Amino acid sequence: MGMRSAARMPKLTRRSRILIMIALGVIVLLLAGPRLIDAYVDWLWFGELGYRSVFTTMLATRIVVCLVAGVVVGGIVFGGLALAYRTRPVFVPDADNDPVARYRAVVLARLRLVGIGIPAAIGLLAGIVAQSYWARIQLFLHGGDFGVRDPQFGRDLGFYAFELPFYRLMLSYMLVSVFLAFVANLVAHYIFGGIRLSGRTGALSRSARVQLVSLVGVLVLLKAVAYWLDRYELLSHTRGGKPFTGAGYTDINAVLPAKLILMAIALICAAAVFSAIALRDLRIPAIGLVLLLLSSLIVGAGWPLIVEQISVKPNAAQKESEYISRSITATRQAYGLTSDVVTYRNYSGDSPATAEQVAADRATTSNIRLLDPTIVSPAFTQFQQGKNFYYFPDQLSIDRYLDRNGNLRDYVVAARELNPDRLIDNQRDWINRHTVYTHGNGFIASPANTVRGIANDPNQNGGYPEFLVNVVGANGTVVSDGPAPLDQPRIYFGPVISNTSADYAIVGRNGDDREYDYETNIDTKRYTYTGSGGVPLGGWLARSVFAAKFAERNFLFSNVIGSNSKILFNRDPAQRVEAVAPWLTTDSAVYPAIVNKRLVWIVDGYTTLDNYPYSELTSLSSATADSNEVAFNRLVPDKKVSYIRNSVKATVDAYDGTVTLYQQDEKDPVLKAWMQVFPGTVKPKSDIAPELAEHLRYPEDLFKVQRMLLAKYHVNDPVTFFSTSDFWDVPLDPNPTASSYQPPYYIVAKNIAKDDNSASYQLISAMNRFKRDYLAAYISASSDPATYGNLTVLTIPGQVNGPKLANNAITTDPAVSQDLGVIGRDNQNRIRWGNLLTLPVAQGGLLYVEPVYASPGASDAASSYPRLIRVAMMYNDKVGYGPTVRDALTGLFGPGAGATATGIAPTEAAVPPSPAANPPPPASGPQPPPVTAAPPVPVGAVTLSPAKVAALQEIQAAIGAARDAQKKGDFAAYGSALQRLDEAITKFNDAG
């Protein structure tokens, strides 16, 4: 029967076409509009920072990759459709009610839409996905050699880092493209009659057979290429149940030959498939494909399984020995743990020490860190916040400076940033939020080895940090009483101010000064930002774009925006670095430092790979998750790496946001490749000023990754490695409130890298024996410019108490538990244990130091300000304990042991420093006059009567009320609080 006339699609009216076009236009605008706005804003932002070349390079690469991938994939699919259409049968017999006829009619009626639209849509999708691999393509184009060859194939490691990922990407796209072309060709032949399923056997036209068979043959050829590339990827493969990474005995002797055999079979099958074109017999390619499938099961999976079970497992240690050695060598190379970086020394850990020997360790005993940066933030807030909208992070930072005597000291440091979330009432108005409250004010540093007085001295500030402040003073001049001079203490960029939604500030001269700056006893002083940073906001185009970006109409209508206005946004230091260097992974800890009289944020940047041959694949989130990261919810994003380098040190100016990248690792091939992709963006290491080098520190995240790997890869013998008997463990944090690994600690102590008594700034960690609580090693990473990056590992034999056992011994000591029981009795004070430091002292000894804090009440509320009350120590199973370091050392080693320990900082009893002598942060309201001595924190076995306990609680409440009134500038409430304080002290003195 002849073919029926095709049913035509109903035609759309002109009005319907217009409505459809409008609807499509709206959809495109909704989808593309925000992205175009973001792209334009990024173009402005990168240009303002001086990194527009980064933006244009990324954009151009993405566009080119998208177009090329889209054209190639779409073109291959289009070719499959076009060939099927051009070679369709001239006459197609049609049975009654044939459903294919209806589809054929629809396709013929919209032939261009189907023939071009489907490949275009597939190509567009492929291009969008492909552009996300722009970095892989750039590394392929610019990557070089490592100068190290893999032990199996003898290829330079640059092949695995830069070339192999690109080849695998291209192969994946070709497989997908050809498969989609096969599907498109198959469907098109079916619709146009080249394939007919009617009747008993159906029919297949010659053109359909040739095209489909050819596409299948190409797929098989591509599979052969995949088998070839699989050989190289074996070197980064981990077989289940093995304690090492990389190709083992089974992989080299079974899987690798199997890949070659399968590749040969695939080539034979491809030839068989192509032969069907001439032989016109589809049974041959069918047999070939079945053979390939069976071969992959028998040769590719079955044979390696037999070798593993019969040959390897019974003799695993000997069989895998060579490959374990490869993994040890490669992992050490990939993570910077080679012999030129890591020095191992034997250390007894339990040698006896005399008072004279301990006192001679001046670099350690004079720098014992008492301030825990995870605990003292509330004290910073209490004494240095000044205004409700200023804020300090929950975890403060550690840095080092020279004190007034030229001695190296570590300090707990913090920038007093603006926290927009703490604005209240009218302060939250858009104008106030974005044009008045724009910046923080001040750099606060506290010597980490001392406090402002003994806690049971008769003054209200005993046990609290001593604050050194750089701040804009009450007369508008900069007061630099900090550890280093600072010209500009105003802070427009920082992690606190950026940790809010819509973290932008509108600055610049537009009439009178508008930004809140500081207060005097008379009025509030204003300020206008004068920095070079910021995107101009004066033009109507810019105002419209930012109004759309932030969904805020005030950009268009507010008169606070003038021709000189700028907008500051993207103010997080780490995110700014990641934006201008998208190839970097940044450290989770960003810290402020004064460098050349400027306040900068220092950010550590890493280059990483995930396919370094024979190197262990490590999860950054797991390796860096210590108790601090868990407690402060600061876990890094999950990313697996097998190679890492701290290749870049970056600074972000806290005032104008300038980002500067410095080359830290001059040998890193990955960094060299990126420096070719983005020339001129990274400054050479020689440009690092000495003042900056003095504040660069060994990064925490890298150290935590390295210590976890050193737990295994310090072992040299492959047989011992396989048995895991000599592995170490990262100790758990012994603090009862912690639930993860003990964090490493920055300290100033004697120089272990040089093995002398000079003071050195270092990052340290204890290591336990495998699955035990005894010490196995002590790791120190030097941050001194001369020895930066050197790791020193003290290996400890015998059974020396680890952190958990030391903490248990201290907390259960009768004198300690009795004293703290009295202090915390009836919930008068909440006891908190600080960081447990492990310090090498004397010749072969290890001293544990643990500060003890107390805060009023039993809760952990924000109004509870912990202060140092005791110092606990342990040395060789003996516990020392007292109000000061000297007392604890004397209790451990005898008189004279604390002779070189830093004493408590002198403090005028109960009188806070005056603004002229040592200015506190700007604050409204009265300054407290001399206060009658508050009762001391109980020491020893002291029993308080219920009346005295009640009076103490009234005293604490009155002091809190006075401080609140001082912040608010409420003189009446302040006077009332002082009266309550006097009455409470009288009650305490009169109580029996």
UniProtKB/Swiss-Prot annotation:
Signal sequence segment: none
Main location: membrane
Membrane spanning residue stretches: 18-38, 63-83, 113-133, 175-195, 210-230, 259-279, 287-307
A GO CC term attached to the entry: plasma membrane
UniProt keyword annotation of Protein transport present: no
UniProt KW NAD keyword: no
Protein's name in the database: UPF0182 protein BCG_3215c
Domain of life: Bacteria
Family (UniProt): Belongs to the UPF0182 family.
PANTHER family: UPF0182 PROTEIN SLL1060
Membrane topology type: Multi-pass membrane protein
Keywords: Cell membrane, Membrane, Transmembrane, Transmembrane helix
Biased composition (Pro residues): 912-938
Residue numbers spanned by region Disordered: 906-938
Location in the cell: Cell membrane
Lineage per the UniProt record: Bacteria, Bacillati, Actinomycetota, Actinomycetes, Mycobacteriales
Native organism: Mycobacterium bovis (strain BCG / Pasteur 1173P2)
